[in-house]
Amino acid sequence: MSDNRYLSVSGIVLRDNKVLLVRQSYGSVKGLLTIPGGYLQENEMPDDALEREILEETSIVVKTRSLVAIRFALNDWWAIFTADYISGEPVPDKNENSEAFFLDIDDALSHPDLTYTTKEVLLQYGKKPSMQKSNFCPAGIDPKEYMLFM
């Protein structure tokens, strides 16, 4: 069994110029606001993980759209995507987060509980082009097991 606890994803989900945020219930950002996300499961692609995590944590259905940023550290990586809002109203899972809600993006950026990294990601979002998922897949490879963002 592989160990995917070092591979994580988060998503910027906008609805009516409001960003989806969660208040974390654990870890180094306990009590702070961040964009929702989580770890990949074994044999799970990042876009599937993002859609699953956001649904589990907030009851919001999304579709992964583009890659905004990726952060590498010595012991992990974290990919940040945009995701299109499809349906649902935010409901916290009460396990990993105590709150889930949409907040005006300008209010989010000035909120004292927003994590520094989330603030930086939101500030940079829209200032530069994001990478879009390509339909390209090399011959002989299952498209469900391959992703290319350009």
Predicted regions: what they are:
Residues M1-V19:
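Conserved N-terminal beta-strand and adjoining loop/helix that marks the start
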Residues S25-G27, F72-A73:
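Short polar/acidic secondary-structure junctions
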Residues G27-G31, W77:
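A conserved beta-turn-beta hairpin within the catalytic core of GNAT-like acetyltransferases
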Residues T34-I35:
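A short gly/proline-enriched turn/hairpin at secondary-structure junctions
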Residues L40-T64, A73-Q124, L148-M150:
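Unchanged
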Residues Y125-M150:
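Charged phosphate-binding loop/patch that engages nucleotide di/tri-phosphates or the phosphate backbone
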